[in-house]
Amino acid sequence: MVTIKEKVFTDVLVIGGGGAACTAAVASARKGADTVLVSKGKIGNSGNTIMIGGSYGMDGESAFYEYHIPEADPSFTKEDLFRSICNDGFNLSDQNMVEQFVEESPRIVYEVREWGREAGQHYKFYRPGNWDVSGRGMGRSLLKGVEKEGSIRLYEDVMIIGLLKNGDRVTGAVGMDLYEGCLLQFEAKEVVLGTGGYQPYSLKNTNSDMTGDGQAMAYRAGARLA
């Protein structure tokens, strides 16, 4: 009979270890919520985030006027970025979400860059308002942000295998410690899935730990997937 080795109680349970999960955990902790962050691998050193690297940015208008980046191009406005994102999505994107992204992402992008600077990572700027950074550099930046917050409880190398429900409400999750083989039960008032995408659609791939856990758990719990 499989038994639960440890029960963890918290206000907010965040599942994942990359960009979405780390920034969600930081935001939760800043609101005063007791926050637990659970990752299948090492936080900031696993998943999609360290694989992609690449470009992170904002509109040039915000970069120049709000964050005082002298090299930025202020002629590339928020409206330009909004249109660019919608066009890239063949105008099928939820435009309310795109608008929210355009308005709120500059603050997050700049703060993550500051975390990276404190962690000794190199971000290369290019116009209109973008930075290039390696995937490893982005991971170290995110880890610095989580560590700076101080109050976030971390559980690494724990694979969440299912969500817990009470009626229609998700109340936590069960995970397996990948090195000890024991089960942990997490009970929370709120649960955030920030587990990234699904990579292994073929036997040979570059990111074998991206197995679609979050999407599968959400679907089994009754969520509608887009």
Predicted regions and their residues:
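Active-site nucleophile and cofactor-binding loops and adjacent substrate-binding regions
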Residues: 17, 48-53, 205-210
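Phosphate-coordination loops involved in phosphoryl transfer and adenosine-cofactor binding
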Residues: 9-11, 157, 188
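Short hydrophobic core segments
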Residues: 13-15, 185-196
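Conserved N-terminal/central alpha/beta ligand/cofactor-binding core
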Residues: 4-7, 27, 33-34, 40-182, ...
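Generic start-of-chain signal for non-secretory N-termini
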Residues: 1-11, 19
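N-terminal Rossmann-like FAD-binding beta1-loop-alpha1 element of flavoenzymes
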Residues: 12-37
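Glycine-rich loop(s) and the adjacent beta-strand/alpha-helix scaffold that form part
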Residues: 190-226
